[in-house]
Amino acid sequence: MTIEQAMELIHGVEWRGSRPGLTRVRELLHRLGDPQDGLQFVHIAGTNGKGSTAAMLASILRAAGYTTGLFTSPYLERFAERMQVNGVPVPDAEFAAVCEALQPCIAAMDDPPTEFELVTAAAMLWFRRRGCDVVVLEVGLGGRLDATNVIAAPACAVITNIGLDHTEILGDTLEQIAREKAGILKPGTRAVSYPQTPEVRAVLHEICAQRGIPLAEVDAAAIVPLTDGVDGQTFTYRGAEYTLPLLGSHQLRNAAVALETVTALRARGWRIPDAAVRAGLAQVRWPARFELLRRAPWFVLDGGHNPQCAQTVADNLARYFPGRRITLLVGVLADKDYPAMLAALDTQAAAYIAATPLSPRALPAAELGDYLKRFGKPVTVCADPAQAAELALAHAAPEDVICAVGSLYMAGAIRMDLRRDHNENSGH
């Protein structure tokens, strides 16, 4: 099977959307020989910070000498990014080979699996074939009925920041959403949580008590920022000092979640030296999360797509670029709470460029442009995200800031274009 045929198999399934429930993925994995049963997992659910926390943990475990799988979604530039071993995305030939193994299993099923179920099963088979010691597994949506929750009790279950997102599927209160996310907490695991709101904490404590699961929570007061700049930050947590290249105070809280997870794994007998923890955090890369792509003019990229993320971006812009003229290049999906996102971001905007993310669910740039006019600032409409980025750069003074925000679907297109541009101009 070629990589093109493999992608056709994955994208050609009848069910593109979400169909909660574990029966299909269970059957599919069983037909594949249950590859997940031979693997150890760190399972991560939450609204925001899942990917960053997963990247930090994978980096730490790799530095500690473990062959480490990482499963995340969605991807930015290439589908293969969704599954990696030791920081390297799945090679085309290996992905095609696991898809070939899936084909007869799918054909034998009465109820065909969804795209996400296929990707999850393909990843499990590939991680098993690659002999992973541990897989850092990010939930696709929710937790309880997410395809990744087909695994037995993981070594550690991690709950990152919980907020309101995907309310049409997960429920419209924080408590309901927390119950869905807490579906990954299985008897026999250890749980770690981000510093949550009181109602979310109450749910996590109740469920962990019911299931006899030890719960470690990040102590926000034990995070002490030391230095902070556009090249990264240093901080101490519970007295030990670390360097983190990711920007924003929320990343310190995500790093503290990773550190508490290390403590939980050590309690289970995992060997993770302090030096590996420091090296893992110092080396972590996680693109499109307040990522600095250019200087003079400054170009910041963030794939955040809900009001919490937008507030974080606004805070970071104020923190790292005070007093500078900021143009916001915005693209959003029509089904997101973009009015609340834009209200948070507008505090930092001098001007706007509206673009259309590469998704069938995108809000057209012209419609977004009309909406942005209410803020009383200059608005330009340029549907193509990469062209919008070029336009913004062409009109910016060297000291100005451009921040592209609102959707990972837009971030990927811009990142690919700007990096290609940079490589061509520098002769790489």
Predicted regions span which residues?
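Nucleotide phosphate-binding/pyrophosphate-handling subdomain across enzymes
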Residues: G38, V134-L137, L145-V158, I162-G163, ...
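Short, high-confidence coil segments that cap the C-terminus of an alpha-helix
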Residues: G131-D133, G323, A397-E399
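Acidic, Mg2+-coordinating active-site environments of NTP-dependent enzymes
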Residues: D111, L118, G131-E138, P154-E241, ...
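Active-site-proximal loop/hinge segments that shape catalytic or ion-binding/gating pockets
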Residues: S407
